[in-house]
Amino acid sequence: MTLEKTTRMNYLFDFYQTLLTSKQKSYMSLYYLDDFSLGEIAEEYHVSRQAVYDNIKRTEAMLEQYEEKLLLFKKFQERKKIFEALRKLTDGQPEAESLIDALEKLD
């Protein structure tokens, strides 16, 4: 698994975890956030490794579908770029910096 995919899944999980079942949340959290192996998760839940794999793959697909429709992660990335551009334009002006900070905290 690539670092890029892991990072993307972590963001998608952050944005959409409230739409997942408790089992999906648990498997994804253990796999992506806590770096558990499929075997470790299977042992923890007394299921087969294949069952964990299937659940994670289905959940990944669901997260991608949510993103395709809601675009929360894409919009987050775009806002981040805008904040960075604004910071360059402020040229260290404290008032402008604090306004940008306030906007970022709203995210």
UniProtKB/Swiss-Prot annotation:
Source organism, top-level taxon: Bacteria
Span of the signal peptide: none
InterPro entries in UniProt: RNA_pol_sigma_r3/r4-like, UPF0122, UPF0122_fam_protein, WH-like_DNA-bd_sf
A Pfam family of this chain: UPF0122
Gene3D superfamilies documented for this protein: Winged helix-like DNA-binding domain superfamily/Winged helix DNA-binding domain (1.10.10.10)
Entries under HAMAP family matching the protein: UPF0122 (MF_00245)
PANTHER family linked: UPF0122 PROTEIN CBO2450/CLC_2298, UPF0122 PROTEIN YLXM
Functional note: Might take part in the signal recognition particle (SRP) pathway. This is inferred from the conservation of its genetic proximity to ftsY/ffh. May be a regulatory protein.
Protein family according to the UniProt entry: Belongs to the UPF0122 family.
Protein's UniProt name: UPF0122 protein BLi01817/BL02321
